[in-house]
Design a protein with these regions (language model features):
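Beta-strand-rich domain onsets/edges
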Residues: 1-45, 50-67, 90, 102-103, ...
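Short, solvent-exposed turn/loop segments enriched in Gly/Ser/Thr/Pro and often Arg
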Residues: 64-68, 130-135, 172-177, 225, ...
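Active-site mouth loops of central-metabolism enzymes
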Residues: 60-77, 142-147, 220-226, 310-311
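Alpha-helical scaffolding within the catalytic cores
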Residues: 71-82, 110-115, 155-160, 200-207, ...
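Substrate-binding cleft and catalytic face of glycoside hydrolase catalytic domains
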Residues: 86, 90-103, 112-218
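Aromatic-rich peripheral "rim/lid" segments of glycoside hydrolase catalytic domains that contact
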Residues: 2-12, 35, 163, 172, ...
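Aromatic- and acid-rich polysaccharide-binding/catalytic face
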Residues: 85-99, 103, 157, 164-169, ...
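Short Pro-Gly-centered beta-turn/loop motif in secreted/extracellular proteins
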Residues: 72-86, 388-396
Length: 422
């Protein structure tokens, strides 16, 4: 039996008091004693050194689908990805099996590899989404019996996780398992094998395959159903030995922002497991809110769904509050907005930029928050040994002094570092 820990909380009231009010972002910072040296190895004693955070450890993310057409130099998408990179350090790339391998044996590995490497070249971390899902599944799987379908699913995971190892090391291994065996919108191969095996058995099979292909990968389970059913599923998976690295939480809020109380309740309930939490797919609108009677978001079909000035101000405020709540929680390691540009899914005004590429207020607000408020930039003075103590947000830092420069890291479990300035 797994020994779970209620993280920082004995009850909801205590949880909220601790996580939201006490040292709000102190858990995002660390102190490191850095020795600065020149290229010859001589300590830079009694020297002013300017240090600046250049890359957050925290994963500030967004859907990165635009990187695929950007690899061909398409102007609109190159412009979008440049704006994307000015804001984010983490992005989700599409590995939907039905798109990735429309014809059996012909995966789009080369295109996805180009996109992932393009992100890496600009300092962004790519995530693959998803390895197993009943929606967007490969139609050709339907020709096979369940045993063969499972075998091909595991082969697919082994192939793709192995091929992308070192480039993509974070994966949504399986998506939306709560609904998977009862999904009845259309017949598909993955729902078939989930019915046959059961949820926990299928989750264990696909996670074990991903872990075997890349033992160091971050492996997520991911779902939009945040009811007790998801908690029960996670509990069953962990007790079955499924190597879940982090819990994925989806919040597509097309029907209105859920607000602080509901967000804190989600954090409270999923902190129970003591695992890192990734908010993997998050949507906030800058236009008309979807009617509440819509059950499946995909059923809401409109000819156009414009962004409005009032909606853009609302979206800006909602994104800021949501980010502040999530960044304040010690177990949250990543937040990913789903659409970078309006009109990407359901034609919704859900992006941080408009369809014409102009920046919305929410883009400016998040850039201010991430790169101006949650940053560290200071000048330190070294001692006789060239050492200086630095306290700042964890991540990658640049250092400069005496017309030379270098870099170092501030990490949670790293008390000392050496920075060579050249």
């Amino acid at each position: 039996m797994i020994n779970y820990v209620y993280y920082m909380a004995k009850n909801k009231r205590e949880y909220r008091e601790v996580s939201m009010n006490e040292a709000k972002y102190a858990h995002r910072r660390s102190t490191v004693n850095v020795q600065f040296k020149d290229a010859s190895g001589k300590a830079l004693a009694d020297t002013d050194i300017k240090v600046k955070l250049t890359g957050h450890e925290f994963l500030f993310g967004c859907g990165a689908f635009d990187f695929l057409p950007a690899t061909d130099g398409k102007e609109m998408f190159v412009d979008r990805t440049e704006k994307w990179l000015d804001l984010f350090n983490y992005g989700t790339l599409p590995f939907y099996w039905g798109q990735f391998e429309k014809k059996e044996g012909e995966p789009r590995t080369e295109l996805l590899m180009k996109a992932a490497k393009l992100m890496r070249e600009h300092g962004a971390i790519p995530k693959g989404h998803p390895l197993c899902w009943h929606t967007e599944c490969a139609d050709w799987l339907m020709e096979y019996d369940n045993k063969t379908i499972l075998s091909k699913q595991l082969d697919r995971i082994n192939r793709d996780v192995s091929d992308f190892k070192g480039v993509i090391d974070i994966w949504d291994v399986i998506n939306e398992v709560v609904i998977m065996p009862v999904y009845d919108r259309y017949d598909n191969a993955i729902t078939r094998i989930c019915k046959d095996l059961g949820r926990v058995k299928l989750v264990k099979e696909v996670f074990d395959a991903a872990k075997a292909a890349n033992p160091d990968a971050v492996l997520l389970i991911n779902d939009f159903n945040l009811s007790e059913s998801y908690r029960i599923l996670i509990d069953g998976c962990l007790n079955a030995g499924v190597p879940i690295s982090a819990i994925g939480i989806q919040t597509h809020q097309h029907q209105g922002y859920m607000g602080r109380e509901k967000l804190e309740d989600i954090l409270y309930r999923y902190s129970f497991f003591g695992l890192p939490i990734h908010f993997t797919e998050n949507t906030l609108l800058s236009g008309k809110i979807m009617p509440p009677e819509i059950v499946d978001l995909n059923d809401y079909q409109v000819d156009e769904w414009p962004s409005t000035p009032e909606g853009e101000e609302r979206q800006k405020k909602e994104w800021r509050e949501m980010y502040e709540i999530l960044f304040a929680h010690p177990l949250v390691e990543a937040v990913t907005g789903w659409d970078f540009a309006d009109g990407a899914w359901l034609k919704a005004p859900s992006g941080l930029i408009r369809e014409d590429g102009t920046l919305k207020p929410s883009y400016h607000e998040l850039k201010k928050l991430i790169h101006e408020e949650w940053t560290t930039e200071l000048t330190v003075h070294t001692d006789a040994d060239g050492k200086a103590e630095i306290n700042g947000y964890r991540g990658q830092y640049s250092a400069s002094g005496n017309n030379i420069s270098g870099s170092f890291d501030v990490k949670k479990d790293k008390n000392t570092d050496v920075c060579i300035l050249k």
